[in-house]
UniProtKB/Swiss-Prot annotation:
Reactions it catalyzes: Release of an N-terminal amino acid, Xaa-|-Yaa-, in which Xaa is preferably Leu, but may be other amino acids including Pro although not Arg or Lys, and Yaa may be Pro. Amino acid amides and methyl esters are also readily hydrolyzed, but rates on arylamides are exceedingly low; Release of an N-terminal amino acid, preferentially leucine, but not glutamic or aspartic acids
Source organism per UniProt: Serratia proteamaculans (strain 568)
Pfam family, one: Peptidase_M17
Cofactor: Mn(2+)
Organism classification: Bacteria, Pseudomonadati, Pseudomonadota, Gammaproteobacteria, Enterobacterales
GO biological process, any: proteolysis
Residue ranges crossing the lipid bilayer per the database entry: none
Cellular component annotations (GO), alphabetically ordered: cytoplasm
UniProt keyword annotation of DNA-binding present: no
Gene3D superfamilies: Leucine Aminopeptidase, subunit E, domain 1, Zn peptidases
GN (gene name): pepA
Protein name, entry field: Probable cytosol aminopeptidase
């Protein structure tokens, strides 16, 4: 789908469709008022008859409006004037895209980016419109033999901005929005792949393909089980021991900083391509969704694509910690004591608390890069879902400034995170009689104790942990990967690169 920006008056638009807003109760937006005046009161007469109230998401499609050059006008409800918030704005864009797609409009000029959204500028409105449009049109049908496509799909969207001086900001918003959307799509596609296709080897092949596509900036190397053994990554290896599929850690290194010696930002993604729970096997119901236990790795892959497409002036390393947790004669057991790469020992009390075992060795491995900071992304705990539901990602960190940066980026991107505490009392829940620590700390505060476990392997750098167990995928009728938190991390890196879109 093609996007562009322009600045012009609505009466001069010659398009398949013009999209304008209507407020409650039956109040025309400034652009709609201009169209109403040109059409000799045609639109306001319809509203007086009660055709459209103006509630958020209501639509009314008008054909061949008098004196209007465009074929159609789509009126869409935007709620109460000057009370339109970020969530409602995205709902309005989503409804607009679905309506245009369903009615066969192949192109449209959208004036919704001129609406007032509290605290948001033109860059934000255009970029969110692009990202929401791409999200709305996303489908995963690669594995279907019969692909159903719209009769006349929407192909072109033009966003109108109030003044010509905002054109540059709008164009930059489209560039950033398309790149972030590309990363989100890549993460969703990876997440939605079935585990018989998407194993650690598949993740490695995708990482290599990304390096091939952006060979100027990205190099990829893959570390297999033999090298992991030599490195002493015994916790990582234990998790994959029950699977026939080899555990593979894919390391993608992007160099975009003009100073090649600048310390890198390291992103680590949990890549459990299927998590049966191991010997502590999961219930059968819903186990199919454990293909999504690699959404942390999918996120990191998607973010690396965004970084490369935008050619950000940063050094970034993305690590996909690929593995599969299966029961079997060679699987690790409850009661085992593992010596991690760091030398610390872990008593295994539950083999279904495996993500932290893969991550702890990966977090030790990345010390060699002398990172500026490290962020891990993982579908780590059901406890985080209980705490924050499916709307907000859990954030924990050993570095306050980094945590504040991530929270700020999450608000900018509309991909929200919430910080949870990590005080000393939680660490005590991990005490073990037989090792330096246990791999679980009991039911209370499970998301926090999991982060406390990881923090014991991150003492040499600034670190943050994103628990995406509640936000990485949806269940039910809308089942599928969400691509979160690609938008959050992309915004964090855009901010770091000084490209945050503030005018």
């Amino acid at each position: 789908m093609e996007f562009s920006v322009k600045s012009g008056s609505p009466e001069k638009q010659r398009s398949a469709c013009i999209v304008v807003g209507v407020f409650e109760p039956r109040r025309l937006s400034p652009i709609a008022e201009q169209l109403d005046k040109i059409s000799d009161g045609y639109i306001s007469a319809l509203l007086r008859r009660g055709e459209l109230e103006g509630k958020v998401g209501q639509t009314l499609l008008l054909h061949h409006v008098p004196n209007i050059l465009s074929e159609r006008i789509l009126l869409i409800g935007c709620g109460k004037e000057r009370e339109l918030d970020e969530r409602q704005y995205k709902q309005v864009i989503q409804k607009t895209i679905n309506t245009l797609n369903d009615t066969g409009s192949m192109e449209a000029v959208c004036f919704l980016t001129e609406l007032h959204v509290k605290g948001r500028n033109t860059y934000w409105k255009v970029r969110q419109a692009v990202e929401t449009a791409k999200e709305t049109l996303y489908t995963f049908d690669q594995l279907k033999s019969n692909k159903v496509e719209p009769r006349r799909p929407l192909r072109k969207m033009v966003f109108n901005v109030p003044t010509r001086r905002e054109l540059t900001s709008g164009e930059r918003a489209i560039q950033h929005g398309l790149a972030v959307s590309s990363g989100i799509k890549a993460a969703k596609d990876l997440g939605n792949m079935p585990p018989n296709i998407c194993n650690a080897g598949y993740l490695a092949s995708q990482a290599r393909q990304l390096a091939d596509a952006f060979s100027t900036n990205i190099t990829t190397r893959v570390i297999g089980e033999q090298q992991m053994k030599e490195l002493g990554m015994n916790a990582y290896l234990a998790v994959g021991a029950g699977s026939r599929n080899e555990s593979l850690m894919s390391v993608m290194e992007y160099k975009g900083n003009p100073n090649p010696d600048a310390k890198p930002i390291v992103l680590v993604g949990k890549g459990l391509t299927f998590d049966a729970g191991g010997i502590s096997i999961k219930p059968a119901e819903g186990m199919d969704e454990m293909k999504y236990d690699m959404c942390g790795a999918a996120t990191v892959y998607g973010v690396m694509r965004v970084v490369a497409e935008l050619n950000l002036p940063l050094n970034v390393i993305g690590v996909l910690a690929g593995c599969e947790n299966m029961p079997g004669g060679s699987a690790y057991r409850p009661g085992d004591v593992l010596t991690t790469m760091s030398g610390q020992t872990v008593e295994v009390l539950n083999t279904d608390a495996e993500g932290r075992l893969v991550l702890c060795d990966t977090l030790t491995y990345v010390e060699r890069f002398d990172p500026e900071l490290v962020i891990d992304v993982a579908t780590l705990t059901g406890a985080c879902v209980i705490a924050l539901g499916h709307h907000i990602t859990g954030l924990m960190s050993n570095h306050n400034p980094l945590a504040h940066e991530l929270i700020g980026a999450s608000e900018q991107a509309g991909d929200r995170a919430w910080r949870l505490p990590m005080s000393d009392e939680y660490y005590e829940q991990l005490d073990s009689n037989f090792a330096d620590m246990a791999n679980i700390g009991g039911r209370p505060g499970g998301a926090i104790t999991a982060a406390c476990f990881l923090s014991r392997f991150t003492r040499k750098y600034s670190w943050a942990h994103l628990d995406i167990a509640g936000t990485a995928w949806r269940s039910g009728k809308a089942k599928g990967a969400t691509g979160r938190p690609v938008a959050l991390l992309s915004q964090f890196l855009l901010n770091r690169a000084g490209l945050n879109g503030d005018d």
